[in-house]
Design a protein with these regions (language model features):
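Structured, active/binding-site neighborhoods that engage oxygen-rich ligands
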Residues: 1-372
Length: 372
């Protein structure tokens, strides 16, 4: 594994995150609240007056920097997961444990620390649902943290969770794969350990699949090999397993990622539920588009962004896989410059984190190969 592939993974995920239309909404959280309220009012005006001019996030008399192209929540939660890998790579901390146990201990400590912040916020609020948290997170993550704060432990924190099926852990799994390059099973096991804090069912299966695929992409495997490893983690009898196999069949009949978009839109993407973040949709879409794009990020990410229902995370998942496959050299310089720095819109403590520097740190934690 080379630093360039880790860098490609992180920058690819960030570029995909930035490419999806929800990114601007997430980044708008750094604007004054009244700007978001005004956007909602303009949307209501358009609905009531039957106008087809739809509002977008606005700055008006405020500095517009938060609304410019850049990564948002997915990239920040991937960096959150990467921090555990960094802690486990420090042999001076918990040095009496194996690296695998250190990594799991680091993950647990990370979640426990955030849950403590949730508990403190809950104590200041009349009820936990109204607590003002020092972060922004998916429903599954917020519920999982609430469960931890209430004294539950995994797998209950992920099982007793209204959004156990979403893909929050799939995003984190992409970064966790760095811990086990070339070893899809151990990468998947680590991703499941983390996923159980917030997910169950397809949410866990999807995390295992993404970790397995990324573990092989980081050592230069072909896209078909990576996708095959992902499929082994998706049971046939599950919705995510059925969707993934069908999506890949569709990819095999398509001439390009662009040609695949309508097929995925009509046969894989759900149009009933309120949120487009089900792992059973976004992971199959990412795997299929990476395959149809032949591992090329410049084709996979724009195609994923075209699927508006799943644009909150499918482009990031596709970008992580194809970014690792092609390495950092496949990320255009313009995208690299726009996406390398986190804004802190979801995790304020990660504001100004440089993903290129994070890739260097992750590479430095890798154990020495036998023979030097």
């Amino acid at each position: 594994m080379t630093r360039r592939r880790i860098e490609g993974l992180l920058l690819g995920l960030a570029a995909g995150d930035a490419a999806g239309w929800p990114s601007a909404r997430h980044r708008a959280s750094r604007m004054p609240e009244w700007t978001r309220r005004l956007t909602r009012e303009l949307d209501t005006f358009a609905e009531h007056n039957a106008t087809t001019t739809l509002p977008v996030p606005i700055a008006l008399n405020q500095p517009p920097e938060p609304l410019r192209l850049g990564p948002s929540d997915d990239a920040e939660w991937a960096a959150f997961a990467a921090e555990a890998v960094l802690r486990a790579g420090d042999d001076t901390v918990l040095g009496d444990l194996s690296r695998e146990l250190r990594t799991r201990a680091a993950i647990d400590l990370t979640w426990t620390a955030v849950a403590s912040e949730v508990a403190a916020a809950a104590e200041r609020a009349p009820e936990i649902e109204s607590a003002v948290l020092p972060l922004r997170a998916r429903i599954s993550v917020r519920a999982g943290l609430g469960n931890l704060a209430a004294g539950l432990r995994p797998p209950a924190t992920g099982h007793d969770n209204p959004h156990y099926f979403d893909d929050a852990a799939c995003i984190r799994a992409c970064a966790l794969a760095v811990a086990y390059p070339g070893d899809p099973r151990r990468a998947a096991d680590l991703a499941e350990f983390d996923a159980r804090y917030t997910q169950d069912g397809d949410g866990v299966h999807g995390a295992r699949a993404m970790a397995a695929a990324l573990a092989l992409a980081l050592v230069g495997a072909e896209v078909e090999t990576c996708v095959a490893a992902a499929l082994t983690e998706l049971p046939d009898a599950t919705e995510i397993g059925r969707n993934a196999r069908h999506a890949l069949t569709l990819a095999g009949t398509s001439d390009s990622a662009f040609a695949l978009i309508p097929l995925l839109e009509h046969q894989i993407v759900d149009h009933v539920y309120s949120y487009g973040i089900a792992a059973a949709e976004t992971v199959p879409v990412a795997l299929a588009l990476a395959t149809a794009a032949r591992g090329r990020i410049a084709e996979a990410v724009p195609a994923a962004a075209c699927l508006s229902r799943v644009a909150d995370s499918a482009p990031a998942l596709a970008g992580a896989l194809t970014g690792a496959l092609g390495g950092a050299e496949e990320i255009p310089e313009s995208w690299r410059d726009a996406c390398r720095t986190l804004s802190g819109c979801a995790l304020p403590r990660l504001t100004d984190t440089d993903l290129v520097e994070l890739a260097e740190l992750l590479e430095a934690t890798q154990p020495a190969r036998p023979g030097g």
